[in-house]
């Protein structure tokens, strides 16, 4: 039976490249001259710390980072950007988490979405991925289009397609 897996993964190497490109853009911006501003990647925690001297500049840094991610092919939906700032001394910062894997709540939403579509496929939640199995490739491709079209707040990839 044909099957495929729905996953949510980010290539950390591409994230590192995006952060380096954002830092390069930061050095070229005239509005950040003589300003303590930084974009730092923490690969252990899978997070990016954006810090600057004012909250407005932090928002500018987040936009620079978001554009760099899009240029590197990373969906900006995979960045979990908080609304509040961390403030210490004279620096404002935000800790942006990278969304990796599918949480159990999200996996249940995907499964419910697929079952509500009345397509003749079966779904299994396997850790941080969802396996979809069906009798025909057309049903599986319809599931792919269904999940791509749904606004679930997280980007998904479809891999391990077997016939």
Swiss-Prot record:
Annotated GO MF terms: nucleotide binding
Keywords associated with the record: Nucleotide-binding
Top-level lineage group: Bacteria
Gene3D superfamilies: 3.30.70.860, YajQ-like, domain 2
Ranges that cross the membrane: none
Entry's Gene Ontology cellular component terms: cytosol
Matches recorded under Pfam families: DUF520
NCBIfam families from the UniProt entry: PRK05412.1
Family membership: Belongs to the YajQ family.
Role according to the record: Nucleotide-binding protein.
Record's protein name: Nucleotide-binding protein PM1656
Organism: Pasteurella multocida (strain Pm70)
């Amino acid at each position: 039976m044909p099957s495929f897996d729905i996953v949510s993964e980010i290539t950390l190497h591409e994230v590192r490249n995006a952060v380096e490109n954002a830092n390069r853009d930061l050095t070229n911006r005239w509005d950040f001259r003589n300003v303590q501003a930084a974009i730092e990647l923490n690969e252990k925690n899978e997070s990016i710390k954006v810090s600057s001297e004012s909250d407005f500049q932090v928002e500018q840094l987040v936009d620079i980072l978001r554009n760099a991610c899009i240029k590197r092919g990373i969906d900006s939906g995979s960045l979990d950007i908080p609304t509040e700032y961390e403030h210490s001394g004279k620096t404002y910062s935000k800790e942006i988490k990278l969304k990796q894997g599918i949480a159990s709540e999200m996996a249940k939403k995907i499964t419910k979405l697929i079952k509500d579509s009345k397509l003749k496929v079966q779904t299994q939640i396997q850790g941080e991925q969802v396996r979809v199995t069906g009798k025909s490739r057309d049903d599986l491709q319809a599931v792919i289009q269904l999940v791509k079209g749904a606004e679930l707040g997280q980007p998904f990839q479809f891999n391990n397609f077997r016939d």
